[in-house]
């Protein structure tokens, strides 16, 4: 996926490079021209949450089929970026859910994920139950299947860092399962 940090000047300011948004847009267009499926990745922060509608418009206008919205996990450079308040996170989810429902009604089947916040699935389920959505049962089944997203670490996904060290996922760098330079991955993962 191609990373965006907002639309236009918001992206450029975060990246510290004027014109970097246009370079990302060019990347999407070039991938599309050669038939390369390309997704969009964006970490929600206080610096870009106000662009949510514009980001969703961009996704629609560029016919992007897979989108990952990450909730900020403040580490490294992210420590300096403000995480969303609970209200901002819920508003972002409401905006996202409403747009996905519009896309679905229009026959646009996009894969939209939210990452690093297992509460998003529960929030969606509670909203569906409140609205009497026929999708609530399917959502509940998916949440039960993957443990709400919290149980996939070390089971459904793994992270192998640049040194060959195996971690339960990309966010559990403090937990080491071994090194693929010394052991077969299948021995470490079994």
Predicted feature locations:
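Short, small/polar residue-rich loop motifs at catalytic or cofactor-binding pockets
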Residues: 151-154
